Every structure is written in C-alpha cells, then in structure tokens.
Amino acid sequence: DCPSDWSSYEGHCYRVFKPPKDWADAERFCSQQAKGGHLVSIERFGREDFVSNLITKNLQRG
C-alpha cells in the first residue's frame, strides 16, 4: 500500500516532487522519502507510460 499522496504501479509507489533537482540531489532526496526510495528507472514501456502520465498530471495541477 502506498501513502495517500503517492501512486501505485506494479507493486511500487511513485510520487512527483517539486521543484526540479539535479540527478544527485534528486536521488538523495528520494532515498530520504521512503526506505529503499530511488529515482524511477524506465525499464519497460508500460512503466514509461505510467510515469509520463503521472508527470503530466502533476504539471497540470501546477
């Protein structure tokens, strides 16, 4: 189960954070948000679509 402000996909939890960070700062930040947390890695087309939609929704919210 994911926290209420996170999204679930294939047994993993995802969340878009703002403002943008460089890779090293973003990876460090993600590891502090949840045990085992990391920046998303796009390894399959389904995940790519999911992450793309998640980012688009968050950008539209402002």
From Swiss-Prot:
Record text on subunit structure and interactions: Heterodimer; disulfide-linked.
Annotated GO CC locations: extracellular region
Principal localisation: secreted
Domain annotation C-type lectin: ranges: 9-62
Protein name per its UniProtKB record: Snaclec aspercetin subunit beta
Alphabetized UniProt keyword annotations: Disulfide bond, Hemostasis impairing toxin, Platelet aggregation activating toxin, Secreted, Toxin
Entry similarity comment: Belongs to the snaclec family.
Listed InterPro entries: C-type_lectin-like (IPR001304), C-type_lectin-like/link_sf (IPR016186), C-type_lectin/snaclec_domain (IPR050111), CTDL_fold (IPR016187)
Record's function text: Snaclec that binds to von Willebrand factor (VWF) and induces its interaction with GPIbalpha (GP1BA) (via the vWF A1 domain), resulting in platelet aggregation. Intramuscular and intravenous injections in mice induce a dose-dependent drop in platelet count (thrombocytopenia). Pretreatment by intravenous injection by this protein in mice potentiates the hemorrhagic lesion in the skin provoked by the metalloproteinase BaP1 intradermally injected. This result is not observed when both BaP1 and this protein are injected simultaneously.
Secreted listed as a keyword: yes
GO MF, any single term: toxin activity
Source organism: Bothrops asper (Terciopelo)
Disulfide bonds: C2-C13
Tissue expression as described in the entry: Expressed by the venom gland.
Locations listed in the record: Secreted
